[in-house]
Design a protein with these regions (language model features):
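Extracytoplasmic/secreted envelope proteins and their assembly/folding machinery
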Residues: 19-21, 36, 52, 64-72, ...
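Amphipathic, coiled-coil-like alpha-helical scaffolding segments used for oligomerization/assembly
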Residues: 56-118, 166, 183-192, 199-204
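Second-shell loop/turn segments in exported
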Residues: 8-13, 52-61, 76-81, 119, ...
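Entry/capping segment at the start of metal-dependent catalytic domains
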Residues: 1-31
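BRCT (BRCA1 C-terminal) domain core and associated BRCT-interaction motifs
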Residues: 290-293, 301-303, 311-373
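Extracytoplasmic
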Residues: 17-22, 31-39, 50-52, 66, ...
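Flexible, polar/acidic helix-loop-strand segments at domain edges
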Residues: 93-172, 176, 180-183, 204, ...
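C-terminal solvent-exposed extensions
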Residues: 5-6, 187-282, 302
Length: 373
């Protein structure tokens, strides 16, 4: 839980604050594996007597207890323990460790997150680690900023774990004892030290699996929510419960050099195929495909091509079957290059910015014209 208790936070109710980040963790001390699944804070959830709301509101309404209950219901798994930390505590942990070594995927310029970071392997201070973990707007041109931020958070958490767990037993125990002041948890210090000892030597590159909850953005009553993609989510959680990686392969965004899901392959950034060519980027986000030519099966085939890029796709018919040209429509100039990428994958089509004529809630709208064969 990355809730921030500073006065500057705009998301609070009474003396409780909304969660800034939520990660569901599975720790397997027998096989010495850990799984980190980030859950969108804006996921629309049912909180029983408190009604439907964004997931991060659970902390503001009922603190850690309601957050744990709500996440457990969403994921369909029992949750044994919880831990939460605010931004200042997170920064202090990194500084107390003498910084952590992180290979920053791309250069970050994001004043809202706290400033600038160079790309590349470096030792991050607490302030620098916080910039990496908070930045969303540095990724505006690539898509869902929350997904990239969540990936960076898991990257930093892995670096923290590596530094703690690579120490000798005595040093590790004293380090955990010292860092405990920054974390609120229902675990006893002795339990944390015992768990750390069983996980000693864990290699984040091969022993930590990670992913993001699959969702689709939707605008409901003037508010943006993330809607859980139930089937994909169930498949992911089934894999997690079996001790498998959340996804069956690494998901890599080549444009930002960010690994969005890890399977223990040892991959930290972008990579190449066996023939030396660069792997295709795996995108995040949603696309609505509309059949505007009346050709049976056109929407299905187009959807499959777009899904290969990594997008979640929803298909249906357009308002008519009279569209002469295929259109890939976006509503933000930062998405122009990605819209063209979709058109290239389809083999036809024109990427164009929405002039207000098209209504859609997804990141992109594709209308198939008669040029689609």
């Amino acid at each position: 839980d990355g809730s921030n208790d500073r006065e500057a936070s705009a998301e609070f109710a009474g003396d409780q604050f909304r969660s800034d980040s939520i990660i569901l963790a599975r720790i397997d001390p027998v096989d010495k594996k850990a799984t980190l699944v980030s859950i969108h804070r804006d996921t629309l959830v049912d909180m029983g007597e408190y009604g439907q709301n964004k997931l991060n509101a659970a902390h503001a309404i009922g603190g850690a207890a309601l957050t744990v209950k709500t996440v457990s219901k969403l994921a369909g798994v029992p949750i044994s323990h919880y831990a939460e930390i605010n931004f200042d505590g997170f920064k202090d942990i990194v500084d107390a460790l003498g910084g952590v070594e992180v290979d920053v995927p791309m250069e970050i310029d994001d004043e809202d997150a706290g400033g600038h970071l160079d790309a590349g392997l470096q030792t991050l201070s607490g302030d620098q680690a916080l910039i990496l973990c908070r930045s969303r707007h540095a990724y505006d041109e690539y898509g869902d900023g929350d997904s990239y931020r969540a990936a960076n958070q898991r990257l930093v958490l892995s670096a923290i774990a590596k530094k703690i767990l690579s120490a000798d037993v005595a040093t590790m125990a004293s380090t955990v004892q010292a860092l405990s002041q920054y974390v609120t948890t229902d675990l006893e210090i002795s339990d944390i030290i015992g768990l750390a000892q069983t996980m000693q030597g864990l290699d984040p590159a091969t022993d930590i699996y990670s992913a993001m909850e699959p969702t689709t953005s939707k605008y409901i009553n003037d508010v943006w929510y993330e809607i859980n993609n139930v089937d994909e989510w169930k498949k992911m959680m089934t894999r997690v419960n079996q001790g498998l990686p959340p996804t069956d392969e690494d998901i890599v965004d080549e444009m930002s050099n960010t690994v969005l899901a890890t399977t223990g392959s040892g991959q930290t950034h972008s990579s190449t195929n066996e023939d030396g060519t660069q792997k295709k980027a795996k995108r995040t986000g949603s696309v609505a495909v509309r059949n505007g030519n009346g050709i049976t099966g056109a929407g299905t085939e187009a959807s499959e091509r777009i899904e290969e890029l990594g997008y979640s796709v929803e298909s249906g018919n357009a308002d008519s079957f009279d569209y002469p040209k295929t259109l890939v429509i976006y509503d933000d100039e930062a998405k122009a290059s990605r819209a063209q990428e979709i058109a290239d994958a389809l083999g036809v089509g024109k990427a164009m910015k929405n002039d207000g004529s098209y209504l859609f809630e997804s990141d992109f709208l594709v209308v198939l014209g008669s040029d689609w064969k």
